[in-house]
């Protein structure tokens, strides 16, 4: 597990905290990522649900309630997640009530009962947390590792590039949905840069 970000899956200990990150999408993919935190604060992306047609950056066009059903189904059918307390953090936009019932309200009131709290959408701080997490320490261990079953994370994250008009940020016209939901979870578990001893190559 050293000097790598992608690792084989393993059974998550029962006492590890589980997070669920969510970026809503309709014509673009929605993204859900489940993360486990170990005793050292290291995060593992252990599972994902990506609402994509198979064509990059093309969403399934399914409504918020159907997305909630699929999220709940994924948790009920996974031994690592079934029966666990899971903290949900999502794009703050799903709490918008300006046009009626919010997406968060729709997903909470149905039998699938998904409860979210709004993630920190500060883009620069979130990008820095991603850098801190992916950096290797002196022993070759990053603070974010990804199970090799998370194919869409592995496909999309390395392809992200900076915004030409704002080089401090990622270009949001890309397939950045996994990046966004990951940021929300990372911002709930912030690292200090002084904990990082060696940058990634």
Residue ranges and their predicted role:
Residues 23, 91, 180:
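Acidic active-site catalytic centers that drive phospho-/nucleotidyl reactions
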């Amino acid at each position: 597990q050293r000097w790598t970000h992608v690792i084989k899956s393993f059974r998550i200990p029962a006492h590890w905290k589980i997070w669920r990150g969510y970026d809503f999408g309709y014509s673009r993919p929605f993204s859900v990522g489940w993360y486990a935190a170990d005793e050292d604060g290291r995060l593992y992306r252990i599972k994902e649900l990506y609402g994509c047609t198979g064509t990059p950056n093309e969403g399934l066009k399914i409504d918020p309630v159907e997305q909630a059903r699929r999220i709940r189904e994924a948790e009920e059918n996974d031994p690592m997640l079934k029966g666990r307390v899971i903290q949900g953090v999502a794009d703050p936009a799903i709490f918008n009530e300006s046009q009626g019932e919010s997406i968060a309200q729709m997903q909470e009131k149905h039998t699938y009962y998904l409860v979210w709290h709004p993630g920190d959408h500060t883009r620069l701080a979130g990008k820095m947390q991603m850098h801190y997490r992916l950096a290797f320490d002196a022993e070759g261990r990053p603070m974010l590792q990804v199970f090799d079953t998370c194919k869409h994370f592995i496909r999309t994250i390395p392809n992200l590039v900076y915004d030409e008009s704002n080089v401090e940020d990622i270009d949001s016209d890309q397939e950045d949905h996994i990046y966004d939901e990951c940021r929300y979870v990372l911002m709930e578990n912030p690292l200090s840069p002084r904990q990082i001893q060696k940058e990634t190559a």
